[in-house]
Regions:
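Short "lid" loop at the C-terminus of a central beta-strand within the Rossmann-like core
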Residues: 154
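N-terminal catalytic or cofactor-binding beta/alpha core of small enzyme domains
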Residues: 2-143, 148-151, 160-171, 179-192
Length: 192
């Protein structure tokens, strides 16, 4: 499907006029002094590419985390992310990943496998997360732990909702995020 600039502008105008969900980006930037960072990256205007942002937004709205963690909507930011990673000891990155499997396949890369994730450049984003983490490691102490959780996208077309295969696995992605945080000593209390 080829989109013209008119199609894109029309779609954005319809979205802006809709009663649909709004993402207040400022609300997703917690104080950056926490040692644990939950980072969702992606472009919410491109269906499945926005997976990471959708996941962290939903978790932030649904849970209170103890001890406090930094929950960051990294969107399509690049080096600006370094500002929000000061003092970070552990990072959990949620992203769309091109791994060559069926759409909706969930990937999980623990710290020791992150080099493979970054070396093969399988993130769908052009922003070099590997470069950001390497610069951060030079600036500060190395990370104690890091995990990447991602999903194989079906669509990177213009659209505001993830595709059906990605939507089906979102609950499991959120469960995996909560499990990793629990392993790091973070409890998640459901907001009522």
């Amino acid at each position: 499907m080829t989109n013209t600039s008119t199609d894109i502008i029309s779609g954005l105008e319809q979205y802006a006029d809709s009663e649909g969900p709004r993402i207040d980006l400022n609300s997703l930037y917690d104080d950056g002094n926490n040692e644990i960072v939950l980072l969702g990256v992606g472009n919410i205007l491109l269906t499945d590419e926005g997976l990471g942002v959708h996941v962290v937004k939903e978790l932030k709205e649904s849970f209170t985390f103890t001890p406090a963690i930094s929950i960051i909507d990294g969107g399509t930011m690049g080096m600006e992310l370094l500002t929000y990673m000061r003092g970070m000891k552990k990072i959990l990155l949620v992203d769309a990943i091109n791994g060559g499997e069926a759409p909706g396949t969930i990937y999980e890369f623990p710290h020791k496998e992150l080099e493979q994730y970054f070396t093969e450049h399988i993130s769908v984003h052009e922003v070099g997360m590997q470069d950001i983490l390497r610069i951060r490691a030079i600036q500060e102490d190395p990370l104690e732990d890091a995990v990447v959780i991602g999903v194989e996208p079906e669509s990177l077309e213009i659209g505001f909702e993830p595709s059906a295969p990605v939507q089906r696995v979102l609950p499991e992605v959120k469960e995996r995020v909560l499990r990793v945080l629990q392993e790091w000593g973070v409890t998640a209390e459901f907001n009522t």
